[in-house]
Amino acid sequence: MNKLRFWFNNARPISLPQSMLPALTAVALSYSRADGAQFSWLAAIASLFGVMLLHLGMNLLDDWFDYKKGSAQAREQVANEGFRGRMVKYPYLTSGEATPKQLLGAVGGFLAFAAVMGAVVILVRGWMILGWVAATLILGVSYSGALSSLVSGD
């Protein structure tokens, strides 16, 4: 349980409103349009947990990409120029509390459980959800600059 709490806290749960509010809005709109006839609480709850797990996993993946890019030095430079901000994005890596390999394991865990939630939604609602999931994953990985790094060779 301590490992789960460790990774949950380092996945920056403070950022969850960014993804959970739109997801909750979608559930509320779906419920109001369904008149109770075709609304599935199972799909709604699985969707909400899936969004949360995906967001946390992508936050950790972003840390991994930043760690690999060496963004700590860039943050120090910005601070030296007088700008304020969060100086250490991944203190659990720089302090030695976790290794990059453990971080990737945590990312895999969050994304695997998100995939299970997605499978529940697919079973209830059909395969069309996969397009949304694929788009979300592409955007999430792109946010970290991974795709642009792969294309440019950095």
Task: List PLM regions with ranges.
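Aspartate-rich (DDxxD/NDxxD/DxxxD) Mg2+/diphosphate-binding motifs
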Residues: 58-109
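Membrane-embedded alpha-helical segments that form the functional core of polytopic membrane enzymes
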Residues: 24-25, 29, 36-61, 131-141
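Hydrophobic residues within membrane-embedded alpha-helical segments of Major Facilitator Superfamily
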Residues: 8, 22, 53-54, 110, ...
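Short, Lys/Arg-rich, polar N-terminal cytosolic tail immediately upstream
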Residues: 1-9
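Intramembrane alpha-helical segments
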Residues: 90-154
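Transmembrane helix-loop junctions in multipass membrane proteins, especially transporters and channels
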Residues: 31-35, 63, 67-71, 123-127, ...
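The first (N-terminal) embedded transmembrane alpha-helix
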Residues: 10-31
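Alpha-helical transmembrane segments of integral membrane proteins
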Residues: 5, 14-18, 42-46, 102-109, ...
